[in-house]
Every structure is written in C-alpha cells, then in structure tokens.
C-alpha cells in the first residue's frame, strides 16, 4: 500500500504564554485586542501600556540624559521593578534591545498600525523566560497580512503649559514571494 508511505505535512506552533480564555491560569495576564488599542487613543505602544495599572513609568535617568544611544527611549516597566526586568517579545520572540548592552526594548521601534494585540503577563515569569522577565512579559503580536496603506493623524491639547500635540503616521505594506514574506515602511512625525 503506497498511501502509508506518504507523510502529511504537520505544522506545530506554540507559545509559552497562556491564552486569555484560560481563566484557570495562576499567572495574571492582560490581553488588549486591536479595537481596545484603538479606543485608547494612544499614539504609540508606550502610551498604551502605561494605561495598564501594572505598568509604571519607563523613564529613568538612563534615558533622559543626553548620552549617546539612550536619550528619548520609551520602555515598559511592569510592577515598578525597572524596564530591565521586563521582557518584551514581538510575536513570541525577543525583540532587539534599544539600549546598547541591555535587553531593554525601545517601544518607539514598533509601529502602532501593525499591532494586532498585546499580551501582558504581569506576574513574574523568570522561571519560563529567564531573569529579564522577573517583573513580567509583554508580547506584542503583529498583523501578519498588512497590505496597502494606513494614514493616521491625531490632534490633542490641553489649556495649561502650551500643550498642543500633533502626530501623523503613514504605513505602507506589501506582500512578497507569494505571501511568504512582507515588507513594511512606517513614517511618523
């Protein structure tokens, strides 16, 4: 029988992050979908995460001074333990560090238009992910089929202290090699 010799293609994918529908998980987890992210009105990942009560300001002396390589960074700081103890993943994989010599991720490097959902483990996850996940894990899931163009313009302000803000973002995306790859270009001002 020749049909017994033919192997079917088996694809196994997984994540160590428990899904939100698993309410019996002992680890506290918050999931924000695309609609929830849009409803926040936030213009970047940093502002979205800082809406969570578990997140503290990621600003520290290291990213407010004028040293090369660290000024202007926006990082996440879960449970007040410091951004160096919060692991940031993109699609379940470690993201490049924004500060040379550390694993601290600059959230400015992730275009908001491409985010499908955010998964935040707010309990310690160092036993699964290592010592840089003592405070928790932020997993940013990106859209894998973004094609076309997205234009976003936001205007805001407040009365005290000259608080007018304007943000514009244009994102282009295209599929390559019959859907096996893609390229995305984002401009933000």
Q: Predicted segment positions?
A:
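Short, acidic, small-residue-rich periplasmic hinge/interaction motif at the N-terminus
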Residues: 1-38, 46
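Extracytoplasmic beta-strand/coil segments of soluble accessory domains associated
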Residues: 50-94
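Outer-envelope beta-barrel architecture signal
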Residues: 86, 145-149, 179-183
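Short strand-turn segments of transmembrane beta-barrel domains in outer membranes
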Residues: 119, 124, 146-174, 185
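Short, polar/charged loop or turn motifs at beta-strand boundaries
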Residues: 27-47, 66, 75-81, 105-108, ...
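Short acidic/polar hinge/loop motifs at secondary-structure boundaries
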Residues: 93-122
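N-terminal periplasmic accessory domains that precede
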Residues: 45-48, 74-77, 106-108, 132-153, ...
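Transmembrane beta-barrel outer-membrane domains
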Residues: 69, 131, 161-165
């Amino acid at each position: 029988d020749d049909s017994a010799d033919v192997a079917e293609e088996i694809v196994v994918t997984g994540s160590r992050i428990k899904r939100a529908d698993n309410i019996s998980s002992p680890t506290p987890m918050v999931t924000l979908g695309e609609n929830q992210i849009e409803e926040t009105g936030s213009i970047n990942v940093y502002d979205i995460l800082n809406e969570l009560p578990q997140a503290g300001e990621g600003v520290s002396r290291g990213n407010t001074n004028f040293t090369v390589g660290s000024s202007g960074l926006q990082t996440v700081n879960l449970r007040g333990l410091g951004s160096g103890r919060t692991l940031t993943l993109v699609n379940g994989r470690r993201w490049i560090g924004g500060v040379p010599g550390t694993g601290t991720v600059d959230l400015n490097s992730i275009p908001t238009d491409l985010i499908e959902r955010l998964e935040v483990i707010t309990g310690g996850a160092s036993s699964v992910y290592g010592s840089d996940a003592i405070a928790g894990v932020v997993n940013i899931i990106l859209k894998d089929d973004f094609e076309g163009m997205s234009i976003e313009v936001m205007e805001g302000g407040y009365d005290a202290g000259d608080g007018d803000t304007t943000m514009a973002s244009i994102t282009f995306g295209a599929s390559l090699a019959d859907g096996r790859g893609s390229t995305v270009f984002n401009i933000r001002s």
